[in-house]
Protein backbone atom coordinates (compact mmCIF):
# COMPACT_ATOMS: atom_id res chain seq x y z
CA UNK A 1 0.00 0.00 0.00
CA UNK A 2 1.46 3.34 -1.07
CA UNK A 3 1.83 6.15 1.47
CA UNK A 4 -1.11 8.56 1.61
CA UNK A 5 1.04 11.42 0.38
CA UNK A 6 1.99 9.42 -2.71
CA UNK A 7 -1.69 8.62 -3.44
CA UNK A 8 -2.57 12.30 -3.30
CA UNK A 9 0.36 13.09 -5.58
CA UNK A 10 -0.79 10.50 -8.17
CA UNK A 11 -4.37 11.80 -8.10
CA UNK A 12 -3.15 15.35 -8.59
CA UNK A 13 -0.93 14.34 -11.51
CA UNK A 14 -3.83 12.48 -13.16
CA UNK A 15 -6.03 15.58 -12.88
CA UNK A 16 -3.29 17.70 -14.41
CA UNK A 17 -2.88 15.20 -17.25
CA UNK A 18 -6.62 15.17 -17.97
CA UNK A 19 -6.90 18.96 -17.87
CA UNK A 20 -3.89 19.30 -20.16
CA UNK A 21 -5.75 17.23 -22.77
CA UNK A 22 -8.64 19.69 -22.97
CA UNK A 23 -6.91 22.11 -25.37
CA UNK A 24 -5.79 19.13 -27.44
CA UNK A 25 -9.38 17.87 -27.52
CA UNK A 26 -10.57 21.22 -28.82
CA UNK A 27 -7.81 21.19 -31.46
CA UNK A 28 -8.66 17.65 -32.55
CA UNK A 29 -12.34 18.54 -32.77
CA UNK A 30 -11.47 21.65 -34.76
CA UNK A 31 -9.30 19.73 -37.20
CA UNK A 32 -12.02 17.13 -37.69
CA UNK A 33 -14.61 19.84 -38.34
CA UNK A 34 -16.85 18.68 -35.50
CA UNK A 35 -16.07 21.77 -33.40
CA UNK A 36 -18.37 23.62 -35.77
CA UNK A 37 -21.17 21.98 -33.80
CA UNK A 38 -19.73 22.90 -30.39
CA UNK A 39 -20.99 25.97 -28.57
CA UNK A 40 -18.63 25.61 -25.61
CA UNK A 41 -15.26 24.11 -24.76
CA UNK A 42 -17.12 21.49 -22.69
CA UNK A 43 -19.00 20.35 -25.78
CA UNK A 44 -15.75 20.18 -27.75
CA UNK A 45 -14.28 18.08 -24.92
CA UNK A 46 -17.31 15.79 -25.03
CA UNK A 47 -16.82 15.40 -28.78
CA UNK A 48 -13.23 14.36 -28.14
CA UNK A 49 -14.39 11.71 -25.66
CA UNK A 50 -16.92 10.52 -28.25
CA UNK A 51 -14.24 10.02 -30.86
CA UNK A 52 -14.80 13.39 -32.51
CA UNK A 53 -18.55 12.85 -32.84
CA UNK A 54 -21.06 15.34 -31.38
CA UNK A 55 -23.27 14.28 -28.49
CA UNK A 56 -26.64 13.86 -30.23
CA UNK A 57 -29.62 14.22 -27.89
CA UNK A 58 -33.40 14.66 -28.34
CA UNK A 59 -35.36 17.45 -26.64
CA UNK A 60 -32.86 20.12 -27.68
CA UNK A 61 -35.38 22.65 -29.00
CA UNK A 62 -35.65 25.77 -26.86
CA UNK A 63 -38.26 28.52 -27.29
CA UNK A 64 -38.18 32.24 -26.62
CA UNK A 65 -40.80 35.00 -26.95
CA UNK A 66 -39.06 38.39 -27.08
CA UNK A 67 -41.20 41.34 -26.02
CA UNK A 68 -41.53 43.90 -28.86
CA UNK A 69 -41.02 47.63 -28.35
CA UNK A 70 -43.38 48.57 -31.20
CA UNK A 71 -46.90 49.06 -29.73
CA UNK A 72 -48.42 47.90 -33.03
CA UNK A 73 -46.90 44.45 -32.49
CA UNK A 74 -48.18 44.17 -28.94
CA UNK A 75 -51.39 42.36 -29.88
CA UNK A 76 -49.50 39.69 -31.82
CA UNK A 77 -47.08 39.25 -28.92
CA UNK A 78 -49.94 38.83 -26.45
CA UNK A 79 -51.59 36.24 -28.72
CA UNK A 80 -48.30 34.33 -28.90
CA UNK A 81 -47.93 34.42 -25.12
CA UNK A 82 -51.47 33.10 -24.64
CA UNK A 83 -51.40 30.42 -27.34
CA UNK A 84 -47.76 29.35 -26.89
CA UNK A 85 -47.42 28.08 -30.49
CA UNK A 86 -43.64 27.84 -30.19
CA UNK A 87 -44.17 25.20 -27.53
CA UNK A 88 -46.03 23.18 -30.17
CA UNK A 89 -43.05 23.57 -32.50
CA UNK A 90 -40.80 22.49 -29.64
CA UNK A 91 -42.87 19.37 -29.06
CA UNK A 92 -43.15 18.47 -32.76
CA UNK A 93 -39.37 18.59 -33.19
CA UNK A 94 -38.48 17.13 -29.79
CA UNK A 95 -37.62 13.74 -31.39
CA UNK A 96 -34.73 15.28 -33.35
CA UNK A 97 -31.38 14.23 -31.95
CA UNK A 98 -29.25 17.36 -32.32
CA UNK A 99 -25.64 18.14 -31.33
CA UNK A 100 -26.53 21.49 -29.71
CA UNK A 101 -29.59 23.33 -28.45
CA UNK A 102 -31.63 25.06 -31.16
CA UNK A 103 -33.65 28.08 -30.08
CA UNK A 104 -36.84 28.98 -31.94
CA UNK A 105 -37.85 32.52 -31.09
CA UNK A 106 -40.28 35.27 -32.02
CA UNK A 107 -38.96 38.81 -32.02
CA UNK A 108 -39.37 42.28 -33.49
CA UNK A 109 -37.31 42.54 -36.68
CA UNK A 110 -38.34 45.74 -38.44
CA UNK A 111 -39.48 43.67 -41.42
CA UNK A 112 -41.73 40.73 -42.25
CA UNK A 113 -39.45 37.72 -42.42
CA UNK A 114 -38.21 34.47 -40.90
CA UNK A 115 -34.76 32.87 -41.02
CA UNK A 116 -32.26 30.47 -39.49
CA UNK A 117 -28.84 31.53 -38.24
CA UNK A 118 -27.07 29.10 -35.96
CA UNK A 119 -28.11 28.47 -33.25
CA UNK A 120 -31.49 30.21 -33.69
CA UNK A 121 -34.60 30.14 -35.82
CA UNK A 122 -36.18 33.60 -35.88
CA UNK A 123 -39.84 34.29 -36.64
CA UNK A 124 -40.59 38.01 -36.85
CA UNK A 125 -43.65 39.53 -35.19
CA UNK A 126 -44.11 41.56 -38.38
CA UNK A 127 -44.47 38.30 -40.32
CA UNK A 128 -46.87 36.85 -37.75
CA UNK A 129 -49.01 39.99 -37.91
CA UNK A 130 -49.09 39.72 -41.70
CA UNK A 131 -50.02 36.06 -41.41
CA UNK A 132 -52.92 36.90 -39.10
CA UNK A 133 -54.14 39.65 -41.42
CA UNK A 134 -54.01 37.44 -44.52
CA UNK A 135 -56.15 34.69 -43.02
CA UNK A 136 -59.80 34.38 -44.06
CA UNK A 137 -62.30 36.01 -41.71
CA UNK A 138 -64.52 32.94 -41.98
CA UNK A 139 -64.40 29.49 -43.52
CA UNK A 140 -63.53 29.84 -47.21
CA UNK A 141 -65.68 28.30 -49.99
CA UNK A 142 -63.04 25.55 -50.18
CA UNK A 143 -63.45 24.72 -46.49
CA UNK A 144 -60.30 26.41 -45.16
CA UNK A 145 -60.97 27.85 -41.71
CA UNK A 146 -59.08 30.81 -40.23
CA UNK A 147 -57.39 28.39 -37.83
CA UNK A 148 -56.35 26.07 -40.67
CA UNK A 149 -54.82 28.97 -42.60
CA UNK A 150 -52.90 30.44 -39.67
CA UNK A 151 -51.69 27.17 -38.14
CA UNK A 152 -50.91 25.55 -41.49
CA UNK A 153 -48.79 28.44 -42.76
CA UNK A 154 -47.17 29.04 -39.36
CA UNK A 155 -46.09 25.41 -39.03
CA UNK A 156 -44.93 25.30 -42.65
CA UNK A 157 -42.71 28.35 -42.15
CA UNK A 158 -41.39 27.16 -38.78
CA UNK A 159 -40.69 23.71 -40.23
CA UNK A 160 -38.97 25.26 -43.25
CA UNK A 161 -36.55 27.16 -41.01
CA UNK A 162 -36.02 24.17 -38.70
CA UNK A 163 -35.22 22.23 -41.87
CA UNK A 164 -32.39 24.66 -42.61
CA UNK A 165 -31.13 24.11 -39.05
CA UNK A 166 -31.27 20.32 -39.37
CA UNK A 167 -29.34 20.37 -42.65
CA UNK A 168 -26.70 22.58 -41.04
CA UNK A 169 -26.32 20.97 -37.61
CA UNK A 170 -26.39 17.38 -38.88
CA UNK A 171 -24.30 18.00 -42.00
CA UNK A 172 -27.07 16.63 -44.22
CA UNK A 173 -25.83 16.64 -47.83
CA UNK A 174 -27.92 18.67 -50.26
CA UNK A 175 -28.08 18.06 -53.99
CA UNK A 176 -30.13 21.08 -54.92
CA UNK A 177 -31.16 24.53 -53.75
CA UNK A 178 -31.32 24.77 -49.94
CA UNK A 179 -34.65 26.63 -50.09
CA UNK A 180 -36.26 23.89 -52.17
CA UNK A 181 -34.93 21.24 -49.79
CA UNK A 182 -36.25 23.18 -46.78
CA UNK A 183 -39.68 23.36 -48.46
CA UNK A 184 -39.60 19.60 -48.99
CA UNK A 185 -38.59 19.06 -45.36
CA UNK A 186 -41.51 21.23 -44.22
CA UNK A 187 -43.97 19.48 -46.54
CA UNK A 188 -42.85 16.08 -45.26
CA UNK A 189 -43.35 17.20 -41.66
CA UNK A 190 -46.86 18.56 -42.29
CA UNK A 191 -47.89 15.44 -44.18
CA UNK A 192 -46.43 13.00 -41.64
CA UNK A 193 -47.10 14.53 -38.21
CA UNK A 194 -50.60 13.18 -38.08
CA UNK A 195 -52.95 11.98 -40.79
CA UNK A 196 -55.91 13.59 -39.03
CA UNK A 197 -54.22 16.98 -39.32
CA UNK A 198 -52.46 16.67 -42.67
CA UNK A 199 -55.34 17.89 -44.89
CA UNK A 200 -56.00 20.90 -42.64
CA UNK A 201 -52.33 21.83 -42.41
CA UNK A 202 -51.60 21.42 -46.12
CA UNK A 203 -54.76 23.23 -47.23
CA UNK A 204 -54.12 25.95 -44.66
CA UNK A 205 -50.57 26.52 -45.88
CA UNK A 206 -51.74 26.43 -49.51
CA UNK A 207 -54.43 29.03 -48.79
CA UNK A 208 -51.77 31.72 -48.43
CA UNK A 209 -50.86 31.18 -52.08
CA UNK A 210 -54.49 31.21 -53.25
CA UNK A 211 -54.31 34.59 -54.96
CA UNK A 212 -51.67 33.23 -57.30
CA UNK A 213 -53.97 30.35 -58.31
CA UNK A 214 -56.71 32.78 -59.33
CA UNK A 215 -54.43 34.71 -61.67
CA UNK A 216 -53.49 33.01 -64.96
CA UNK A 217 -50.48 35.32 -65.30
CA UNK A 218 -48.38 37.13 -62.75
CA UNK A 219 -46.07 39.97 -63.74
CA UNK A 220 -42.86 40.20 -61.73
CA UNK A 221 -39.48 41.87 -62.28
CA UNK A 222 -36.96 39.68 -64.10
CA UNK A 223 -34.67 39.95 -61.06
CA UNK A 224 -37.28 38.06 -59.02
CA UNK A 225 -36.26 34.86 -60.80
CA UNK A 226 -32.79 35.21 -59.25
CA UNK A 227 -34.21 34.90 -55.73
CA UNK A 228 -33.03 31.95 -53.65
CA UNK A 229 -36.67 30.96 -53.12
CA UNK A 230 -38.85 29.54 -55.85
CA UNK A 231 -41.72 31.65 -57.14
CA UNK A 232 -44.74 31.43 -54.79
CA UNK A 233 -46.87 29.63 -57.37
CA UNK A 234 -44.09 27.06 -57.92
CA UNK A 235 -43.82 26.47 -54.18
CA UNK A 236 -47.58 26.00 -54.02
CA UNK A 237 -47.63 23.42 -56.80
CA UNK A 238 -44.66 21.60 -55.27
CA UNK A 239 -46.44 21.41 -51.90
CA UNK A 240 -49.71 20.16 -53.40
CA UNK A 241 -47.89 17.66 -55.61
CA UNK A 242 -46.04 16.15 -52.65
CA UNK A 243 -49.28 15.91 -50.67
CA UNK A 244 -51.11 14.24 -53.56
CA UNK A 245 -48.18 11.91 -54.18
CA UNK A 246 -48.17 10.88 -50.51
CA UNK A 247 -51.91 10.10 -50.40
CA UNK A 248 -53.95 10.45 -53.64
CA UNK A 249 -57.16 9.59 -51.77
CA UNK A 250 -56.80 12.03 -48.90
CA UNK A 251 -55.72 14.84 -51.22
CA UNK A 252 -57.90 13.96 -54.21
CA UNK A 253 -59.58 17.36 -54.02
CA UNK A 254 -56.40 19.22 -55.02
CA UNK A 255 -56.79 17.63 -58.46
CA UNK A 256 -60.58 17.47 -58.60
CA UNK A 257 -60.89 21.19 -57.83
CA UNK A 258 -58.13 22.12 -60.25
CA UNK A 259 -55.64 23.42 -57.69
CA UNK A 260 -52.91 21.20 -59.12
CA UNK A 261 -52.61 21.15 -62.93
CA UNK A 262 -53.31 17.67 -64.30
CA UNK A 263 -50.10 17.85 -66.32
CA UNK A 264 -48.14 17.71 -63.04
CA UNK A 265 -50.11 14.86 -61.44
CA UNK A 266 -48.34 11.84 -63.05
CA UNK A 267 -45.01 12.86 -61.50
CA UNK A 268 -46.29 13.43 -57.96
CA UNK A 269 -45.98 9.85 -56.70
CA UNK A 270 -42.35 9.75 -57.84
CA UNK A 271 -41.60 13.18 -56.38
CA UNK A 272 -43.02 12.18 -53.01
CA UNK A 273 -41.15 8.87 -53.14
CA UNK A 274 -37.86 10.68 -53.66
CA UNK A 275 -38.47 13.10 -50.78
CA UNK A 276 -39.66 10.33 -48.47
CA UNK A 277 -36.65 8.14 -49.37
CA UNK A 278 -34.26 11.03 -48.68
CA UNK A 279 -35.99 11.69 -45.34
CA UNK A 280 -35.72 8.01 -44.38
CA UNK A 281 -32.03 7.84 -45.27
CA UNK A 282 -30.81 11.24 -44.07
CA UNK A 283 -33.15 12.42 -41.29
CA UNK A 284 -34.73 9.37 -39.61
CA UNK A 285 -31.38 8.09 -38.23
CA UNK A 286 -31.38 11.24 -36.09
CA UNK A 287 -34.92 10.81 -34.74
CA UNK A 288 -35.90 9.27 -31.41
CA UNK A 289 -38.60 6.76 -32.39
CA UNK A 290 -40.35 6.72 -29.00
CA UNK A 291 -40.79 10.49 -29.00
CA UNK A 292 -41.78 10.40 -32.67
CA UNK A 293 -44.64 8.01 -31.91
CA UNK A 294 -45.87 10.41 -29.23
CA UNK A 295 -45.83 13.28 -31.74
CA UNK A 296 -47.68 11.24 -34.36
CA UNK A 297 -50.42 10.34 -31.87
CA UNK A 298 -51.40 13.95 -31.17
CA UNK A 299 -53.56 16.56 -32.88
CA UNK A 300 -51.78 19.78 -33.85
CA UNK A 301 -54.68 21.91 -35.11
CA UNK A 302 -56.44 23.75 -32.25
CA UNK A 303 -60.19 24.11 -32.17
CA UNK A 304 -60.12 27.51 -30.46
CA UNK A 305 -60.73 30.59 -32.56
CA UNK A 306 -57.81 32.80 -33.56
CA UNK A 307 -58.42 36.58 -33.51
CA UNK A 308 -58.59 37.69 -37.16
CA UNK A 309 -58.73 41.22 -38.51
CA UNK A 310 -61.60 42.32 -40.70
CA UNK A 311 -60.75 41.84 -44.36
CA UNK A 312 -60.96 45.60 -44.99
CA UNK A 313 -58.26 46.24 -42.40
CA UNK A 314 -55.74 43.80 -43.87
CA UNK A 315 -52.54 45.28 -45.32
CA UNK A 316 -51.77 44.95 -49.02
CA UNK A 317 -48.39 43.27 -48.58
CA UNK A 318 -48.64 39.52 -49.10
CA UNK A 319 -45.03 38.38 -49.23
CA UNK A 320 -44.26 34.77 -48.40
CA UNK A 321 -41.22 33.30 -46.68
Question: Which residues does each PLM region occupy?
Answer:
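Bacterial N-terminal signal peptides
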Residues: 21-30
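Pan-zinc metallopeptidase signature
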Residues: 46-61, 221-321
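Active-site metal-coordination segments of metallo-dependent hydrolases
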Residues: 69, 75, 169-185
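Zn2+-dependent metallopeptidase catalytic core
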Residues: 76-101, 131
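Catalytic zinc-binding patch centered on the HExxH motif and its immediate surroundings
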Residues: 105-122, 127-136
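Active-site recognition of the HExxH zinc-binding catalytic motif
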Residues: 123, 156-171, 183, 187
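Short pre-active-site segment immediately N-terminal to the catalytic Zn-binding motif
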Residues: 134-156, 171-174
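Post-HExxH zinc-binding segment in Zn-dependent metallohydrolases
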Residues: 177-216
Amino acid sequence: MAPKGLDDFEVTMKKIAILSLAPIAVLVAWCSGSVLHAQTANEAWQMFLNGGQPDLQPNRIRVQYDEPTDPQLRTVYEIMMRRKPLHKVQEIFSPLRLPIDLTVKTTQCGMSNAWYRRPEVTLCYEYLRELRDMAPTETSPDGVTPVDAVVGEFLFTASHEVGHAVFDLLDVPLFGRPEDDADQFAAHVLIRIGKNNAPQLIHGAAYMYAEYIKRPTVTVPVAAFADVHGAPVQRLYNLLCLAYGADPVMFADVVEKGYLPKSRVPACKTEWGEVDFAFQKLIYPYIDRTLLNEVLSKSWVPYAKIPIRRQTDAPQSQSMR
